[in-house]
C-alpha cells in the first residue's frame, strides 16, 4: 500500500515536471515565432499558428489592469493625426487580466469612424467572435482564427489573426487582418507623464491585411502598417 502510494506521488511529480517542461518548450517556440513575425515585417505572409490556442482569451500582465488613455501614432504616415481612445482591462474569474473587448473595440471604432459606428457586440458563446454595427445597414463580422502569445510578467507580446466580413445590402467583402502587439512598461525617458499611480505603457502594433484567400499560406500581405502606442493610466 505504502509502495503504491509513494509510486503514485512520484508519478504525479514527474507529470508536473513534464508539464512544466512542455509549457516552457511551447513558450520558447512561441517567442521564436513572434520574434520572427516582428523581424519579417513588413514582408509578412499569412501566419501559420502552430501553437495557437483560441480557447483562451489574451492574458495581459497584471500592470495592465485598469483604465487607460491610449495614443496611437501611424509611423508609416506622418500626416495622420494620432488616434486617441480609452481602453479597459480587468481581472476575470480566474484572476487573469483580460481586455474588455467590446468596450475597447467600440472606443477604438468611435475614434476612427466617429458617428458612423453604432455599437460593438461580443458573441456570448465565443470569445473569438464580435459584430460591429455601422450606419446604412453595414456591419462587420469578426472571427479570430489564430492566437499566439508568450507568458512574460514584464512584457505583453502576442499575435492574432482575424477574418473580417463586411456585410452591406446586396454584397459582402472578406478580409484577413493580422495584429502583432508588443508592449512593456515605459522607460522614464520614453514617458512624458508624471502619473505616479502606474507607469505608462509603451509599445508597437504591426498590422497586416491579406485579403480574402483564407488559409492560403503563400498569401503575401496586401498592406502593412506600424503604430507606436502609449498608454497613460486614468482613474475612470
Please place each PLM-identified region on the residue numbering.
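Short helix-loop boundary/capping segments
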Residues: 124-218
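Surface-exposed, polar helix/loop patches in the mature regions of secreted/periplasmic/lumenal proteins
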Residues: 90-146
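Amphipathic/hydrophobic helical signal segments and adjacent flexible N-terminal regions
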Residues: 20-67, 71-113, 209-236
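Classical Sec-dependent N-terminal signal peptides that target proteins to the secretory pathway
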Residues: 1-24
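Short secondary-structure boundary segments
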Residues: 10, 26, 138-140
Amino acid at each position: 500500500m505504502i509502495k503504491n502510494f509513494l509510486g503514485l506521488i512520484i508519478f504525479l511529480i514527474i507529470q508536473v515536471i513534464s508539464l512544466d517542461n512542455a509549457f516552457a518548450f511551447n513558450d520558447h517556440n512561441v517567442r521564436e515565432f513572434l520574434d520572427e513575425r516582428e523581424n519579417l515585417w513588413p514582408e509578412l505572409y499569412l501566419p501559420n499558428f502552430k501553437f495557437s490556442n483560441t480557447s483562451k482569451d489574451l492574458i495581459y500582465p497584471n500592470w495592465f489592469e485598469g483604465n487607460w488613455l491610449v495614443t496611437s501614432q501611424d509611423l508609416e504616415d506622418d500626416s495622420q493625426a494620432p488616434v486617441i481612445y480609452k481602453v479597459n482591462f480587468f481581472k476575470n474569474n480566474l484572476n487573469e487580466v483580460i481586455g474588455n473587448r467590446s468596450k475597447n473595440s467600440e472606443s477604438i471604432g468611435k475614434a476612427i469612424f466617429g458617428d458612423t459606428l453604432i455599437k460593438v457586440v461580443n458573441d456570448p458563446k465565443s470569445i473569438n467572435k464580435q459584430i460591429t454595427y455601422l450606419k446604412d445597414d453595414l456591419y462587420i463580422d469578426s472571427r479570430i482564427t489564430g492566437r499566439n502569445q508568450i507568458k512574460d510578467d514584464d512584457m505583453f507580446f502576442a499575435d492574432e489573426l482575424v477574418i473580417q466580413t463586411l456585410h452591406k445590402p446586396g454584397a459582402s467583402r472578406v478580409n484577413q487582418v493580422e495584429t502583432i502587439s508588443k508592449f512593456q512598461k515605459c522607460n522614464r525617458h520614453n514617458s512624458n507623464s508624471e502619473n505616479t499611480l502606474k507607469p505608462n505603457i509603451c509599445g508597437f502594433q504591426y498590422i497586416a491585411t491579406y485579403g480574402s484567400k483564407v488559409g492560403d499560406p503563400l498569401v503575401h500581405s496586401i498592406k502593412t502598417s506600424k503604430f507606436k502606442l502609449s498608454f497613460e493610466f486614468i482613474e475612470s
